[in-house]
Amino acid sequence: KFDWGYQSVKQTQLNNRKIYFPRGKALGGSSIVNGMIYIRGVPQDYDNWRQMGLDGWGYSDLLPYFKYSEGSINRKNKFHGNRGPLKVEPARNFSELDKAFIKAAVDSGHEFLDDFNADKRSGVSRVDSTTYLGVRQSSAIAYLKKIPKNLKIFTNTTVSRILFNKNKAIGIETTDG
């Protein structure tokens, strides 16, 4: 009911199995069914996009937008925002088993990181979560509390195409009439 039920084509390297790709079918999209881990891409990947000609898509270009959207509860540094609509806090499901896993990784030579979204990305850490006081923060919860005047929400409607006038979206086409 809340998942589109997508699967990959058969994967020859995986005994011809199809891989399930959960995708949310509700306001908030996949943020209603994902693992709620808040982790950004590796800065070098964004910088590679910029080097390939995507001006404005380097890490330093995007970091202000990441920070603007983030409402971190506990992080107070140059990599995080604290006033954004998407609330982020340390994952609450941090058990003794999680702690033992991190200790084992550190004992075997992996670096402990305090923050996966800071400047270093290779290591082991407790993750941040898109939750607030233990409640899932979907993109619908984050961005639709105050619905903008220029936004009309259609539920139980499948969009087949976005209509554009040059670079501006001016409407939609639906399969539901």
What are these model-derived regions, one by one?
Residues 1-65, 173-174:
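N-terminal glycine-rich phosphate/pyrophosphate-binding loop and immediately adjacent elements
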Residues 50-169:
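Conserved redox-cofactor binding core of oxidoreductases
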Residues 167-177:
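Short, intrinsically disordered, charge-balanced linker/junction segments flanking boundaries
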